[in-house]
Amino acid sequence: MCGIFGVWNLDQRPIDIAGVRRATDAIRHRGPDDEGYLLVDTRNTRPISCAGPDTDRRLTIPQIDRYKSEEFDLAFGFRRLAILDLSPGGHQPMASHDGKVWIVFNGEIYNYRELREELAGHGHNFKTTSDTEVILAAYQQWGESCVEHFNGMFALAIWDSAAKKMFAARDRFGEKPFHYVYIPQRLFAFASEMKSLWAAGLAGRRIHEETLALFTQHGQVEIGEQTIYENIQRLPQAYCLTLTADGRLQKRRYWDIDPRERIEGWTDERYAEQFREHFTSSVNLRLRADVPVGSSLSGGLDSSTVVSVINRLLPETAVQKTFSARFDDPSRDEGKWMDLVTQSNRVERNDVWPTAERFFEELERLFWHQEEPFTSSSVYAQWSVMRLAKQNGVTVLLDGPGLEYSL
């Protein structure tokens, strides 16, 4: 995961560069590999790409501290977790070749290779092997409808200096977060995590009482656009937004599932075969990375299926790393089911044993990361699994949440 942040003072007040730095520092944990900034005077000047203390030293761009806040009314901040194209070519914010379009992007476009080939056929040239550059070319080719071409998980924001507008989008299922504050005619700010907005002094922490009531009733906070904090919204899944210099914000849904669509006359065997083909293709696309990829294994049908499919897709000499949470309580532990999976596949097994004592010791840190309330200690178990993967040098984990509803 990467971390993105941006602010646009729609009334052309100067931005607070120190606040931009604080906002980006607040999400350093999302991207330890690189740091970058974009400063823009939307009235007349060319955008300026800037560096911070953690910027890749192979890049020769000026430090953000050289500039004064009163010169700019828009800024982007970025923290990178490098997954595709580990070179400095993947640095963000990234510009189009003509310098007119800039992007900050968190996530991965799984079909970037196919899109790259298609866009090359339209005359686009590429200098890197990153999916970020593909998004920029797609935007220049198809405009805002570019998101309809993406197969992936993403949250992105684009500054179009020629049109003087900002375009933002979130993936079809809301895998990547996009929080924002919008004060008409005055301010628009966005971030991967709300702590960036707090660090920059752009949002408060007053609780939204209706959302809190819904949480106590349903046990969920991601029900609509409203977060549990009064003045912070989330861009819904499969939505994009456009913000123009006159302060107008428009949102639209770019994708949906039509429940009226039906496939009639298929045999059970054909349904199963079609599902198998789509599922295998989906897993295979998610293995595209320039860093180590592992799997989260819970013992359930969902993650067990993912591990088994990966085993068939990898070369015969390759061994995948799995990461699992185990429990002393036999009624909660799924170790025997994990054993069945690991014994029949080429797997290097890694286990972590979360305890109630560790849970309470780390609860404050877990709250800091989660930002909104949750109802199950399984959040802590999953957090422990992710930490174990990091300790073992694995950057990307495939997992099964949601898949059990299909299987």
Where are the language model's segments positioned?
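Acceptor-substrate binding/catalytic loop of class I
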Residues: P373-S376
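Active-site adenylate/phosphate-handling loop in enzymes that bind or generate adenylated species
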Residues: R172, Q185, S384-L407
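Cysteine-centered catalytic environments shared across enzyme families
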Residues: M1-E371, Q382
